[in-house]
Design a protein with these regions (language model features):
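Conserved catalytic core of nucleotide-sugar-dependent glycosyltransferases
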Residues: 146-147, 157, 161-245, 249, ...
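Structural motif
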Residues: 75, 153-155
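A short, glycine-/small-residue-rich helix N-cap motif at loop->alpha-helix starts
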Residues: 134-141
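Active-site nucleotide-sugar/metal-binding loop of Leloir-type enzymes
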Residues: 143-153
Length: 347
């Protein structure tokens, strides 16, 4: 009997220790999660809870179901210039994307025919394509509030960017939780120099004052989801903003981040201000520029490109009288959600 008690005691001990270990690991992982304030006002866990409760909500009305169905779809907008061969590859690729309502092509090849006739001759296609021919080759043409856009979600893509279907689907699911922000794959930041002049930098660029890296204050719209309202918000910006974009043929993405940040300042509840964007780490994002038979190189190859973007940061700050961009270090990854930002490859 005594030996039986000993065996039972050992058995209980073996059961208790794994449970204690699991509790300790769970507590440690929870402690590692940053509070909402550390993420520039992004309440990640709150957003996830809201999404879960909405899915589990039992009785929903017809109107609510229709609204949810509309939320399940999005529109792709691609502005293109002198890259028809790549464009056709992209159109074929994006036809396989789930929940895609339509693709709008902003055609900046002034005086040249669109490939619409060729596209139609190879029907049927699961996703309709609309070509919007432009009167002039302007960078900000893609930011028009086109009447054809009837989904809240817009995925804007550069005409040399191929994004994998899983990346798109994952980012769309993230955007539905952060639909008032830009959710995209290319983060950038502004850096304040000791003289009060702003400099445009990449994600890893160190801040000379804090020596901090791995934070961002912008998410570029060349591969990003955002709400269609921001197209009209951009159109409503001061004429000086539009003139700056036209003057440089650059910086429309920076201007959009300013516009979104200002909109969030005005419409967000609470004291913590949200950053303009949320960074989603891509798994497979490719640049197809070298595949273009035209040999046309994007404007980012120009030697003055980065200088222009620093100039735009300072000029926009002058126009608005404030620097509205907020920093965040949140990165959302398909293999760790949520996670601290660190997109450097270990390979």
């Amino acid at each position: 009997m005594r030996s039986l008690r000993c065996l039972l005691g050992l058995r209980r001990a073996y059961l208790v220790w794994p449970i204690l270990l699991l509790l300790l690991v769970g507590a440690a992982l929870t402690a590692l999660l940053p509070p909402a304030g550390d993420q520039g006002g992004i309440d990640v866990l709150g957003a996830l809870r809201r999404a879960t409760s909405r899915k589990e909500s039992p009785a929903r009305g017809r109107a609510e179901e229709e609204e949810e169905e509309e939320e399940q779809r999005f529109t792709i907008v691609i502005q293109t210039y002198n890259r028809t061969d790549i464009l056709l590859k992209l159109l074929n690729h994006y036809q396989a994307v789930p929940h895609l309502q339509q693709i709008i092509i902003v055609w900046n090849n002034i005086g040249k025919q669109t490939p619409l006739k060729l596209w139609k001759s190879l029907q049927p296609h699961p996703v309709p394509v609309v070509f919007k021919e432009q009167a002039s080759n302007l960078m900000r043409n893609r930011l028009q509030a086109f009447p054809e856009i009837d989904t809240d979600a817009v995925l804007m893509l550069d005409d040399d960017t191929l994004l994998s279907v899983p990346d798109i689907s994952f980012a769309f699911s993230v955007w539905k939780q952060f639909s008032d922000q830009i959710v995209g794959f290319v983060p950038r930041k502004h850096v304040s120099t000791p003289g009060g002049v702003y400099s445009y930098g990449s994600f890893e660029l160190q801040d000379p004052e804090t020596a901090g890296g791995d934070k961002y204050s912008m998410v570029l719209i060349g591969a990003a989801f955002f709400h269609r309202r921001y197209l009209q918000v951009f159109q409503d910006q001061p004429a000086a903003v539009h003139a700056l974009v036209d003057e440089t043929q650059n910086c429309d993405d920076i201007a959009v981040n300013f516009a979104v940040a200002l909109y969030l300042r005005e419409h967000s509840a609470g004291t913590v201000k949200k950053p303009s964007g949320v960074f989603v780490k891509p798994v497979d994002l490719r640049n197809l520029e070298k595949d273009a038979s035209s040999g046309y190189q994007g404007m980012w190859h120009r030697p003055e490109h980065l200088l222009q973007r620093s100039y735009c940061l300072n000029r926009l700050t002058q126009i608005y009288g404030v620097m509205p961009l907020r920093f965040s270090n949140l990165m959302i990854s398909q293999f760790g959600f949520p996670s601290y930002a660190n997109h450097k490859s270990s390979a």
